[in-house]
């Protein structure tokens, strides 16, 4: 890989999941049909999931299943669906969506990023004009709320106003309705690494508040900078050493946590970097906030 593609032999590669998230979601939607002898036809650009489980009904939300959730980390998408349905939302996915364009944008290929942006904004402007659009990956979310605007994509502003980071959306709802979710009470220590793209747009302090909505938990948002991975950057052989140097402060912070501390990181690149550089975490692995919440649900 290093000779043919320039990828560092020291860097692990993402694993492909046995089942794609969107395919799991399609089965999940069919399983939720009231009459098992029928199948519910999805809307043109969305596929509805289970809604009738006795939860308070709050309407529909659209979950943006980014590339890594779809192909590599479907368990994070499944966790998010579990939490959102427990809150009473009908969850939908966007059919025919394309990559948000972050890789192209980060490499300066603005035309390619604009093309996929126009496609995605067009999809989200058709049919359902009111549902919130939730993102699990901060780098995708920031494309929609910030970079599509800079690319001057038509209707980007309208769509951006409907886009929310999953964690912030859930925390805002629980601030208004603290009893909307019931969580297991158990003592645990949680350390949170906030994503650069999220920090550039909002104060990450809410993540501590959200984690501590789980009874018995004590959370800290680590005072850290970039993880040094930045998707393909940290995988390149010529950039690997620099990537590790950038991560040094973060890794030191995590190493200094109490044994058994749960590590939360919203970004897939951040989780990848942490797991690679702290081998003992590979058995417990860093988690997304959606997983922390879903695992604690009663």
Model-predicted segments: where are they?
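Iron-sulfur cluster-binding electron-transfer modules in prokaryotic oxidoreductases
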Residues: 1-298
